[in-house]
Amino acid sequence: MTLSRVHQQLITFPAVKTSPAGYLPDPASINKLQIPTSSKFSFLTGKGKSMLRKKKNDSFTNGVRDQDKLGPKLTETVKRKLSLGARILQMGGLEKIYKRLFKVSDEEKLFKAYQCYLSTTAGPIAGLLFISSKKIAFCSERSIKVASPQGELNRVHYKVSIPLCKINGVNQSQNTTKPSQKYLEVVTVDGFDFWFMGFLSYQKAFNCLEQALSLSFKQ
């Protein structure tokens, strides 16, 4: 994928040691991937390759491929649910986690957060999908290795932030041969698509996002 100058903007990589597991590392160790309302993209790249996927005809195929990879991991996800809940309570709840991970406006309200996977060109990434009155935001559960501009490998948490006003549509899909494999495709006005899968509460996540978008359009 050839990237334009606008699309090649990089957030500063941290030089500090980061935690390999769990949410809420030192904020300085979190790498941000955001879609600001100006329609310009800032995103994370590693070894010259973007982890974002431009909308292509094979996007659904890639999503199915990633879902197939999750077969043995879904059981692990369920097992992690209790430990994640304990960590959330320990850190003061989802609201505090959300405000620490992302920039939140005074009038913004967090609706829900759902465990899922985000499909990337590097494979599916486990994390939390936050849905608020202003945006959807994803943060990886574990840190990942990326190359800094100096060529050094650092561990950072992978984050995506998409304002609701930049979402062009949300599509529900499922594997026809494996109906239990369901996906949420979020398409932006700029033509990028994001595939979320492996939800513990798929329909609830879709309904919450649908309601958030409906409320956003009325404002």
Swiss-Prot record:
Residues of the GRAM domain: 96-174
SMART domains in the record: GRAM
A Pfam entry, by short name: GRAM
Protein name listed in UniProt: Putative GEM-like protein 8
InterPro entries xref list: GEM-like (IPR037848), GRAM (IPR004182), PH-like_dom_sf (IPR011993)
PANTHER family from the UniProt entry: GEM-LIKE PROTEIN 2 (PTHR31969)
CDD domains: PH-GRAM_GEM
